[in-house]
């Protein structure tokens, strides 16, 4: 196939593969490339149009496609037993409609990129030395070994949670007593990130589903239906709400107004109902 050519570095600056545009910021480089095409007579036309651009969820910086080496887990063999477990009723979902959501994701699953280029996290347990590669939590014997600089996706440790917290891989008394469990209570927004992966991990590493029942709670959203978050600043202070309306009124309002199996769109005015 065609050679894989990377034209910018990790900071969005054009690299040595960019010729005359080397050292330019990506935004300036775009303008220079267009101008160069026009000067050479290769620019047929320009037109305005709208295109979706991915953004970092933290800083909202536009994301650039970037070729790099990453670690992946082949997921299809892991998904097959998890699909069968749901179809046979070994794992049941409440509300029941989430079974379809769970199955649809697993039946169309893609390989999982588990490596991240972050300064914090669980280090990937792979070591390199002079063309050698070793997989080990601890550094191999001898000098000169260098650990992989990437860390694992946070969900990679989370999918092991049902049995890792009980002492696994050791066969501890807690592991024998509490795994598998009966009930998992969580939010439906992480059914893919966590629930499905925990089922896959349990079947792969323990030979059993980690829980038989999954209950999805409602999610408290703002009046516009957005998930509450620090970055949006749309989450009310519960202490202030309780001081204003009373703790019992807040509790009753949330319980009474939340529709069964659906998310609640929160408006402070609705706390008057509870009071």
Description of each model-found segment:
Residues 1-131, 226, 232-233, 237-275:
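Residue patterns forming the tRNA-binding/recognition surfaces of aminoacyl-tRNA synthetases
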Residues 1, 5-11, 117-262:
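Alpha-helical recognition segments enriched in aromatics with Gly/Pro capping
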């Amino acid at each position: 196939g065609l050679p894989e050519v990377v034209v910018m570095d990790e900071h969005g600056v054009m690299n040595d593969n960019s010729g005359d545009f080397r050292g330019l910021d990506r935004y300036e480089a775009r303008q220079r490339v267009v101008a160069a095409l026009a000067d050479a007579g290769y620019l047929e036309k320009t037109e305005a149009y709208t295109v979706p651009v991915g953004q970092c969820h933290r800083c909202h910086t536009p994301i650039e496609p970037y070729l790099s080496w990453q670690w992946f887990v082949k997921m299809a063999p892991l998904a097959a037993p998890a699909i069968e477990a749901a179809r046979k009723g070994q794992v049941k979902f409440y509300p029941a409609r989430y079974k379809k959501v769970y199955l649809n994701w697993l039946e169309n699953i893609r390989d999982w990129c588990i490596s991240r280029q972050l300064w914090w996290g669980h280090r990937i347990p792979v070591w390199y030395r002079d063309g050698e590669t070793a997989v080990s939590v601890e550094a191999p014997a001898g000098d000169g070994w260098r650990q992989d600089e990437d860390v694992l996706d946070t969900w990679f440790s989370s999918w092991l949670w049902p049995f890792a917290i009980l002492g696994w891989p050791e066969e501890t008394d807690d592991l024998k007593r509490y795994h598998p469990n009966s009930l998992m209570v969580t939010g439906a927004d992480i059914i893919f990130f966590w629930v499905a992966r925990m089922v896959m991990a349990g079947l792969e590493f323990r030979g059993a589903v980690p829980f038989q029942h999954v209950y999805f709670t409602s999610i408290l959203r703002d009046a516009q239906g957005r998930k509450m978050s620090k970055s949006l600043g749309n989450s009310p202070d519960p202490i202030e709400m309780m001081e204003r309306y009373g703790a019992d009124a807040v509790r009753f309002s949330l319980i009474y107004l939340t529709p069964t199996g659906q998310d609640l769109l929160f408006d402070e005015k609705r706390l008057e109902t509870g009071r």
